[in-house]
Structures are given as structure tokens and as C-alpha cells.
Amino acid sequence: MLRLIALLVCVVYVYGDDVPYSSNQGKCGGHDYEKDGLCCASCHPGFYASRLCGPGSNTVCSPCEDGTFTASTNHAPACVSCRGPCTGHLSESQPCDRTHDRVCNCSTGNYCLLKGQNGCRICAPQTKCPAGYGVSGHTRAGDTLCEKCPPHTYSDSLSPTERCGTSFNYISVGFNLYPVNETSCTTTAGHNEVIKTKEFTVTLNYTDCDPVFHTEYYATSGKEGAGGFFTGTDIYQNTTKVCTLNVEIQCSEGDDIHTLQKTNGGSTMPHSETITVVGSCLSDVNVDIMYSDTNHPGEVDDFVEYHWGTRLRFFPLPKRCTPVS
């Protein structure tokens, strides 16, 4: 208790060590204020003048109570009440304390309809661009501007933030397998989407994919096999659909089912994949899938990778194989 009293005494007199002095033609130095021809000490931010100065006594300053503040040097008779809590579409960006008013701004997904002296007073939800349209910018107030997605781009969701994404006209599905025993090096042209050996069958099924698969490829080197399925480049993916690939590797022996997990890659284009291995002929499988816009090489690619097993060193596809019609 004595410690608290000592602190309050210090607060009261820290601004009042010197008695007031006479003003110079109504002017005072620093932050001092003039009263009845005397220059008196002002209170620091976070305090108010609980008693103004007089002959022989300087200003008495007291701290602001909770919910009130003073932001600058002053000799005000009371602290200012803080703004009320931020509600609705408003979120607090500056809490109320002894030296600051509460500041409210729009929460994510909203924009300011009415600005106040300190923050925003009224917020409203931003416009959401429908599927087939993307965000092109914002109004001066911060509302969303939408534009129809140009050719070879897409937006498939109702969103106040999503811009039109790029599409693709080429898909390559490459895989590496271990161990394999049968020696092979073949290229197959035609709408087959199946690679078959004595040990396993690799089948590619797909739905809602516009680029057309027309080439299959498989080769071996030692105990490792590599192959793939490839499309042409003359058709772009319809951006209102999601290209879905299902790659199944069916061993000639066993019936265990393993679903490969994605280990690398993101998605900025409309596609999804499922990769499964059925049977017990393989210990390691790696599947790489690339979606590309060949008219913008290196700029517009989605690359995803799926892996199962522990062996990570795989050999690349041979540059040449004997075509098989």
C-alpha cells in the first residue's frame, strides 16, 4: 500500500516540481500552457490535468482510467473516451490504451464504405467474382472489380480474391518402376492408354480432359523401367472442367492396393490425379505429371509428383525406341 501511495505521489509531482513562472507577453516555453499570466506545466500523453495551476502551485496530472486516453501533451480536464468495440465486418487494428484510441479497420474480404477520423466506421463485403470471371483490380474504396477470363485462362470458384488462372494444352504422365525383369523399349501410337508387360499392366483413365492422349512409351534398363503417356498440343483444357487422371499399375501377382501420395508440386490449373498400385511385383514407384501451356514454355507449368517406396534413383527415358503400331 505504501508503495502504491509513493507511486501516486510521484505521478502527481513529476510534472509539478517547479512553480509556475510569468509568461512573456502571453507566451510560454516548450509544451507549457498559459493561465492568468502564468506559464504552467502540461501533462504527458496518458494523463490529464486533474487540477490546473495557480499562484505557487503547478498542474496536477492524473493517469487516464481504463477506456479513456489522451494522445498528446495536454492540460485537459478529463481524458477522452475510447471508441467502442469493433463489431460486424470491422476488426481491431489498434487496441484502446491510455495513449491511443481504439482503431477499427475492415476484416479480410470486406472494404470500407465510410472512413472515420481514425480507421473505418462502416465496412461491407467485397464483391465475389463468379466462376469464369477473375479479379482484375479494386475500386478506390477497395471493392473488387471482376473481368471475364480471357482464352486459355480460368477461374472455377466464387471468390473476392481469385484471379483468372492459366490453362494447359499438353499433359505428360511419366513413371519409373523398380524392380522389373522383362527387357523392352517400345513406342506405341494410338488411343490405347495401356502399357502391358508380362509383369504388370499400366492403365491411364481420364475424365474431362480436353488435350488428347495419343502416345505411350515404355523402356527398361537393368532392373528399372520407365514409361509415359503423352497428349498432343492442339487443344486447350476447357477451364470450366477439372481434368481428372487415374493411373493404375496392376501387377500380375498379388492384390494389395497402395495409393501413392503426392510428394511435390502445387496446382494453379484445373486438374487432379489418383495413382494406385495393385499387387506385389514392385517395391518402388515414381510418377511425374506435367501440365503445360506450350505457347508459353517454362512460364506456365504445373508439375506434380507421386512416390511410393524407398529407392529414389531413377533413370530417364531413352531418347529412341522402336515404334510399335
Curated annotation (Swiss-Prot):
Cystine connections: C28-C39, C40-C53, C43-C61, C64-C79, C82-C96, C86-C104, C106-C120, C123-C146, C129-C149, C164-C185
Glycosylation sites: N105, N181, N205, N238
Signal sequence segment: 1-16
A Pfam cross-reference name: CrmD_SECRET
UniProt TNFR-Cys repeat ranges: 27-62, 63-104, 105-147, 148-186
Single GO MF descriptor: tumor necrosis factor binding
Cited PROSITE patterns: TNFR_NGFR_1 (PS00652), TNFR_NGFR_2 (PS50050)
Superkingdom classification of source: Viruses
GO biological process terms on file: positive regulation of membrane protein ectodomain proteolysis; regulation of T cell proliferation; symbiont-mediated perturbation of host defense response
Keywords attached to this entry: Disulfide bond, Glycoprotein, Receptor, Repeat, Signal
InterPro entries: Poxvirus_TNF-rcpt-II_C (IPR010806), Poxvirus_TNF_rcpt-II (IPR011172), TNF_chemokine_rcpt-like (IPR051670), TNFR/NGFR_Cys_rich_reg (IPR001368), TNFRSF_N_viral (IPR034059)
Glycoprotein recorded as keyword: yes
Protein task: Binds to TNF-alpha and beta. Probably prevents TNF to reach cellular target and thereby deampening the potential antiviral effects of the cytokine.
Protein name (database record): Tumor necrosis factor soluble receptor
